[in-house]
Curated annotation (Swiss-Prot):
Gene Ontology annotations of biological process type: methylation
Pfam families per the UniProt record, alphabetical: LCM (PF04072)
UniProt EC number: 2.1.1.-
The protein's name in its UniProt record: Putative S-adenosyl-L-methionine-dependent methyltransferase Mkms_0379
Domain of life of the source: Bacteria
Enzyme class: transferase
Keywords recorded for this protein, A-Z: Methyltransferase, S-adenosyl-L-methionine, Transferase
Residue numbers binding S-adenosyl-L-methionine: 128, 157-158
Family: Belongs to the UPF0677 family.
Gene Ontology MF terms in the entry: methyltransferase activity
Signal sequence, renumbered to the chain: none
Keyword Methyltransferase included in the entry's annotation: yes
Length: 300
């Protein structure tokens, strides 16, 4: 169960979800027709060791009961491939528009500073818990990897004064910026999401961009059942006990009321657009597909 001042590293609580997502991206990259290729996703899983490394060991059978090799896992990998492709394209468009400041909120194991073809002069600010950033930095440094853009770590909890920490790291609010909140909002209570959006708006000059992944809350009784099901299966801390199921202002409306032009895309529509199944009627995965929207906004 979450509490207001909890913290984590890469293998505990919210931090462990970054490994789950990285494993999904790595499995997507192994497909003959991947939607996105993250060459570092498998590297992070191997560095974490244990079951995470075991998913990719040559000649070893994956754990037969690992969720990523279930029907749900297959759909989740499709989702991660599509989500990665969408936000990669978002950054390409922002870069083409002349934006040279990028902010990754709750960066986790995002490797875009290393794998995207950033224009010269681009600075990528990565905000996350100190131990999460440390893990990523050490793993990639050990391999001799160098970021394409200038990468600046901002070790801060997004429930604290992250705006001050970001500007102290060199971020210039007078210049256009591109923001990303990917796989983040569900881990924030509604009040924290409001504060996050307000911070983005306050620090964004005209011609800035913002992209978020958001979801509609589940019915309370369904959410309570899912939490109890997770506990009963001995999987507490996997997902439902980590997220907040609170109603919040939709990103399209919130940014639109403040002078941004926001365009939402449903996950189901985007999956179809990129040639992946969108089983909205599936009893296990359908609710998630139907609930998620990917939103891009630009500030006039």
């Amino acid at each position: 169960m979450r509490h207001d001042n909890d913290s984590w590293d890469i293998t505990t609580s919210v931090g462990s979800t970054a490994l789950f997502v990285a494993a999904s991206r790595a499995l997507e990259a192994r497909k003959p027709d991947p939607l996105a290729v993250d060459p570092y996703a498998e590297v992070f899983c191997r560095a974490a060791g244990g079951d995470w490394a075991g998913l990719f060991d040559a000649g070893a059978d994956p754990k037969p009961d690992h969720v990523l090799f279930s029907e749900f896992g297959e759909q989740f990998v499709n989702f991660q491939g599509a989500r990665t492709r969408y936000f990669d394209a978002y950054f390409a468009a922002a870069s083409d528009a002349g934006v040279r400041q990028v902010v990754l909120l709750a960066a986790g194991l995002d490797s875009r500073a290393y794998r995207l073809p950033w224009p010269d002069g681009t600075v990528v600010y990565e905000l996350d818990q100190p131990r999460v950033l440390e893990f990523k930095r050490e793993v990639l440094a050990e391999r001799g990897e160098q970021p394409v853009a200038q990468r600046r770590e901002v070790a801060v909890d997004l429930r604290d004064d992250w705006c001050a920490a970001l500007t102290a790291a060199g971020f210039d609010p007078a210049r256009p910026s591109a923001w990303l909140a990917e796989g983040l909002l569900m881990y924030l209570p509604a009040t924290a999401q409001e504060a996050l959006f307000s911070g983005i708006d306050a620090l964004s000059a005209p011609r800035s961009w913002a992209a978020v992944e958001e979801s509609v809350p589940m019915p309370a009784e369904v959410f309570a059942y899912k939490r109890e099901e997770e506990r009963a299966a001995g999987e507490e801390g996997t997902f439902f006990t980590l997220v907040y199921n609170e109603r919040h202002a939709p990103a399209e409306r919130w940014f639109g009321e403040r002078g941004w032009a926001a365009e939402p895309t449903s996950l189901a529509d985007y999956l179809t657009r990129v040639g992946r199944p969108a089983p909205v009627d599936d009893p296990e995965f359908g609710a998630m597909i139907s609930a998620i929207r990917l939103v891009t906004a630009t500030k006039g």
